[in-house]
């Protein structure tokens, strides 16, 4: 899907190079030299691997778990077809979901919340957990230890755009469609970095994969 480097699609190559080699606090480069000798030219944007070559099988993850890779190899050796799960992370997460469904009335970052309730769904506690939009390949390791999912395994096969799916889930949890007193812009204002939150690992594979100039 492009991974974390894909967030570079929010800037031009020139902006990235200037920030990395000239403007960064740790860089001493008074002449403003951009390294270029024997350095390959950067493409205009990061692309998912599927746009660069034909893919027979993609095992997602950043990085993929060793047991998932091992099982994939064993499946091939048995002459069987590898099938990735179509379920999302919430379906395997051990945390308790409210009987009436997920609901939010605030968004908090983890340091603002403090220590989450040990067994309750993180979304209902105000944390943006990417579980609803992420494929269930990791065993919900992060939510199990009270860290919200960041979406590093990418979407399920049923989802075209991981970030869009999560934005829809947040809007639903807030009751934006049902409660007309909830202002969508007010909800969005509670997120300091919308793209970085919803597309940390998949921006290059999104329906809109880069900042439009």
Question: For each of these PLM feature ranges, what is it?
Answer:
Residues 3-59, 63-213:
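Iron-sulfur (Fe-S) cluster-binding modules
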């Amino acid at each position: 899907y492009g991974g974390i480097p894909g967030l570079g699609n929010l800037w031009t190559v020139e902006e990235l190079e200037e920030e990395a080699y000239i403007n960064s606090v740790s860089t001493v480069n008074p002449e403003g030299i951009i390294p270029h000798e024997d350095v390959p030219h950067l493409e205009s944007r990061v692309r998912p691997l599927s746009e660069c070559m034909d893919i027979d099988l993609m095992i997602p993850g950043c990085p993929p778990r060793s047991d998932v890779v091992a099982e994939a190899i064993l499946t091939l050796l048995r002459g069987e077809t590898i099938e990735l799960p179509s379920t999302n992370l919430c379906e395997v997460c051990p945390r308790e979901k409210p009987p009436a469904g997920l609901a939010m009335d605030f968004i908090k970052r983890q340091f603002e919340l403090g220590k989450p309730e040990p067994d309750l769904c993180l979304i209902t506690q105000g944390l943006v957990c990417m579980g609803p939009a992420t494929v269930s390949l990791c065993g919900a390791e992060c939510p199990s230890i009270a860290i919200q999912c960041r979406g590093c395994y990418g979407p399920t096969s049923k989802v075209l755009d991981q970030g869009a799916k999560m934005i829809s889930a947040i809007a639903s949890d807030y009751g934006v469609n049902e409660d007309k007193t909830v202002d969508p812009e007010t909800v969005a204002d509670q997120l300091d970095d919308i793209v970085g939150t919803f597309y940390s690992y998949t921006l290059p594979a999104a329906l809109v994969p880069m900042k439009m100039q």
